A protein has these predicted regions:
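Secondary-structure transition/turn motif
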Residues: 25-29, 68-79
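Short, aromatic/basic amphipathic alpha-helical patches
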Residues: 151-155, 172-183
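Consensus positions within tandem repeat domains that build extended binding/scaffold surfaces
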Residues: 103-105, 125-128, 151-154
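Edge beta-strands of extracellular beta-sandwich domains
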Residues: 33-40
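Serine/threonine-rich, repeat-prone extracellular segments and beta-strand-based repeat modules
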Residues: 2-32
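GGW-centered surface loops in extracellular recognition modules
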Residues: 50-75, 178
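Extracellular interdomain linker/stem segments of modular secreted and single-pass surface proteins
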Residues: 41-47
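Structural signature of tandem-repeat unit edges
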Residues: 39, 62, 78-100, 109-123, ...
Length: 183
């Protein structure tokens, strides 16, 4: 069999994350024979991807709405003053849940004044906000944080007068938790 003589090959959606299709169509004496197949294009786990100056690390490469990422850091650490870590991020047209903040992700981001943490975050690494001396306001929208999944010194070195806005049901637990983690 010779390509373009006996058959043609067409691809659809084969460059971006998601489901791609390949179609092989017979020509000449093979006319009328068609074969179709689909395959998934995913990001490899641990792959780093930057979207809007926030670098993410893929923790689950699923493309069916169950993919997850962790925030690795920011590309403008020396100048950024505010940061919103949402519930999800779109990478290549696919939504990934943001479920973590890596260790030292924002360490020494000295101009960072306010941070919002999305409701899907269930892990904050050690020293994640270490030495963010200007950090004065942290809004926490998740109820999934515990002593086991917030790393040591996650908030050490932030502004002493920093205020935390947290879910009502977590006020007492989070006050104790964040204090234990350096706030």
């Amino acid at each position: 069999l010779k390509k373009n003589t006996d058959y043609t090959v067409k691809y659809k959606n084969n460059k971006n994350i998601g489901t791609a299709t390949i179609t092989v169509t017979g020509k000449g004496k093979y006319k009328g024979i068609t074969a179709k197949a689909t395959f998934k294009i995913t990001l490899p786990e641990k792959q780093k991807v930057t979207v809007s100056k926030i670098t993410y690390r893929v923790t689950n490469a699923a493309v069916n709405g169950k993919g997850t990422v962790s925030v690795k850091g920011i590309t403008d650490k020396k100048t950024r003053t505010s940061l919103t870590i949402g519930k999800t991020v779109k990478i290549g047209g696919v939504s990934y849940k943001i479920t973590g903040i890596d260790s030292s992700a924002f360490a020494n981001a000295s101009k960072l004044k306010s941070v919002t943490i999305g409701s899907n975050v269930r892990q904050i690494g050690a020293k994640a906000f270490y030495n963010c001396k200007s950090l004065a306001k942290v809004t926490v929208n998740t109820s999934k944080l515990t002593d086991k999944n917030v790393g040591a010194n996650a908030f050490k070195g932030i502004k002493p007068t920093c205020t935390f806005k947290v879910p009502k049901a977590k006020i007492s637990a989070y006050k104790k938790l964040f204090k234990a983690k350096g706030a």
